[in-house]
Amino acid sequence: MNAIITRTYIILIPVLSILLSGCTEEKSIKAAVVSARKEASKIGVEIMKKGGSAFDAMIATDLALTVCYPNAGNISGGGFLVYRTADGKTGSLDYREKAPIAASRDMYLDKNGNILPDKSTLGGLAIGVPGTVAGLEAIHKKFGTLPWKDLVQPAINLALNGYVVTEKQELSFAEKKQDFIKINGENTFYAQNFRANDTVKNLALANTLKLIAKHGKAGFYEGAIANDLVERVQETGGIITHQDLLSYEPVWRDPINFQYKDLNIYSMAPPSSGGICLGQIMKMIEPFNVGDYKHNSMEAIQIIVEAERRSYADRSLYLGDPDFVKIPQNELLQEKYLSDHMKSFTFERASKSTDILPGTISWEESEETTHYSIIDPMGNAIAVTTTLNGSYGSKVFVEKGGYFLNNEMDDFSSKPGFPNMFGLIGGKANAISPQKRMLSAMTPTIIEKNNKLYMIVGTPGGSTIITSVLQTILNVYEYDMDIQTAVAAPRFHHQWLPDIITFEPNKFKRNLFDSLQKKGYDIKEEYNRIIGRVDAIKVSDKGIISTGADPRGDDEASLLY
């Protein structure tokens, strides 16, 4: 077994360094990385200290998360990048996973048309064709300044020298241990009893990264890594072949662009639903001046929830992979269409999701995702959200390679009208088809104000990604919160179906729930999972950089002065 564990019990006294958690605001800050792990954030900043750009730092940060954040960091999943260069040019990269060539619409249904339990979430059949390494190489070819091998080496070093398990990770490993054993056997790498403060060295992953450092994309999609991946997928019931790996290509796309008051917002286009849904919700609430109501007041919550309800209804019908289905993108963001959508809203009574159908248009995702935000000294900004979908993906572990494989196939509509693991309803537009990209809720977002960079924001959280990003933006813009306060503020969520407002536990007052219930809203609070873990960067009109790292996770910011 390629594992080395050391266990220490040392209390460390924090010292002042460039690695800081939470909100920092200093005129001297030149660059920042905010991610799910301090090791990854620090590696990203170290790359920029050596003269690398935000794009170089992105590659190094991403690969570091593969090592120290194995529940979502990955070389075997996919993601989305939204960027803004220092001269104001914007764009995005789609390196979302794809369905295998052998995939079929009804592959998760039995002979009676019923969904087969766990087939799209656990084991080899749940695995989509990975896009991460191809995406990273595409970014490097277009924007990279430092040599590729220099960007991979820090992750290799981290795998060899080890990362320290946090208390939250200890709980995560323990929670999934039986799934790891069920799929991979008792001797699988992450079935060991890793505990907080252990140092975990993943030698197999270090060797995998060495091949990627030497051969780039070809090192993953061809040769020994590809052979081990295909073998592991197929022996656990999957259908990915070498042809699937060789045919994978990422796609450069135009981001969704919309205005909210004096903000100019760029977010991810389909196959992510994030940009369109975020745009719809913000345009629907704009006429109500939500900032006139107290933060998280009943009225503010009503406005936001009713807009969310209507947008998620549209999501279920219209959104999918634009390479396979025609998406009425412009119509979905038209002000008249959105205004008509909200006409049935009243403060007096909750709308019912059963009465809210997707709007009529004439026209021919896991909570264990991870997000990071980066700004470099030149002013380049990137927002990246990447995922294995569920926590540790399919739970299939490639022992020879040291990494988990995704369960991204669950983000398709296995059966139109039925929910996925996050409770999201999908329609025919998101039905399974060979080499199709599955719909996502990932919402990496970059915002301008007065033609200047204003905010970089995103989060994991499955179906709650869109609403968590939304509330963070509103907290800063409408309620004048600093970025750390905005990131940490209590959140709530509605997604059309199920017709429930989900509140972060123990953060809202009982009398608020009573008032909402009297108006016909169903409330859920007890035993809910955390709603998002936002990582964000804000730039003031004077150019002062501040960071927000979500305290709900182990997230930290690393800064370059």
Where are these regions (language model features)?
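Noncatalytic scaffold domains of N-terminal-nucleophile
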Residues: 25-42, 46, 54-216, 220-222, ...
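Extended C-terminal subregions enriched in glycine
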Residues: 436, 478-529
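C-terminal motif of bacterial Sec signal peptides marking the signal peptidase cleavage site
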Residues: 20-22
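Active-site rim segments in enzyme catalytic domains, especially the processed small/beta chain
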Residues: 67-92, 239-241, 381-449, 479, ...
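Bacterial N-terminal signal peptides that target proteins for export
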Residues: 1-11
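M16/insulysin-pitrilysin zinc metalloprotease superfamily fold
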Residues: 181, 275-291, 447-455, 461-487
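Internal maturation/activation junctions in enzymes
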Residues: 287-387, 397-401, 416-417, 425, ...
